[in-house]
Amino acid sequence: METPIKKEIVDGLVAELGITDFAKATIREVKQVAAKSEKASGVEFIKMEMGIPGLPAAQVGVDAQVKALQDGIAHSYPDIQGIPVLKEAASQFVKAFIGIDIKPEGCIPVTGSMQGTFASFLTCSQRDKQKDTVLFIDPGFPVQKMQLEVMGVKYQTFDVYDFRGEKLGPKLESYLSKGNICAIVYSNPNNPSWICLREEELQVIGELATKYDTIVMEDLAYFAMDFRKDLSTPFKAPYQATVARYTDNYMLLISGSKAFSYAGERIGVTCISDALFHRHFDDLSERYQGLPFGPVFSTRMLYALSSGTSHSAQYALAAMLKAAYEGKYDFRKEVNVYGERARKLKEIFCRHKFYVVYDKDLDEPIADGFYFTIGYPGMTSGQLALELMYYGVSAICLITCGSEQEGLRVCTSFIEDHQYDLLEERMKIFETNNPR
């Protein structure tokens, strides 16, 4: 059976890297196999494993950061709470595109949402000794679980695939009722499945978070990228869906990486509700000199981690957020290309007997966006991921994202125009070699 890349090349590299179960191969392991296979074979790979922005950084941010550096900002430490212009811009941005009010004091810059998540985990897990476990609504970003492993915090997970709509509440309550859950974590839109939790589902999450005094960490890394709706007009509905309408127990993690393609500078904001920011918890007060939740997050956790966020990058994010909410910069228009790529890729895969694993948001077809998921009849995740390597296509298995479904995560960010024909040609051979 002929394949575009000889099996011996791929299998040899997999063995060389010590990967015994390809279903559990990490993103960087898959990337390494793909890069080395491409070099050894001379055959171009269609790389779909890395979730890296495939667009230029927003120029308005670059210009503002360069100006800040030229003005001499690099010599001084940034305020641990963040520069006022960014805090104000973040507050206005949240109002403009989410439709909720958070005071500037609760909008705190972080060194990428990764740091925001780490500091949030630290703060949430220490607020109450009885609440020592984080709950993930999976699938999700695997590195967040690694963060908890690094800090020694327990976590539980469930795959939301079979628990959408009215099934979500009872499933959540089965965990929350035990009294040990300090935080609920999910991304919306979701990495890797691209499902978008609906308002009625977010309402259930919010109401249960209030009932069981649990904090919701809403990861908005792919902000406003539900391309089924026009979320691009500031201060006008429809808005980005959020749990913030249904509880005061929330933290919003907003990243500059995907919406503004500003990943390299590691900049984001964590927005803490006004009520939670000022709330006192006995265990936090005892440990941190009587400080309430918000100042513990910033003046203890963030201070200990990095003593602030890059001064010049804060000016970049402030400029991008301000240009967006003033209607001068349509960030949604810039990232729309990811949706177009997903639509074309899905058509090719589905034409050759693949199927979309997470294919619905309740009664509505899933949006096209930065990620989507694929499966192939009769193949496990590991089998499919390895088999596609022989065809010069690389992607990661859903099991690494906490999913219980057999399939792969496909990222659209690195797809180039000439690769659609290439993929069509290779998937035609794949289908012939793997008849169903």
Could you say what each language-model-derived stretch is?
Residues 30, 48, 65, 90, ...:
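Generic structural signal for small/hydrophobic residues in well-ordered secondary structure
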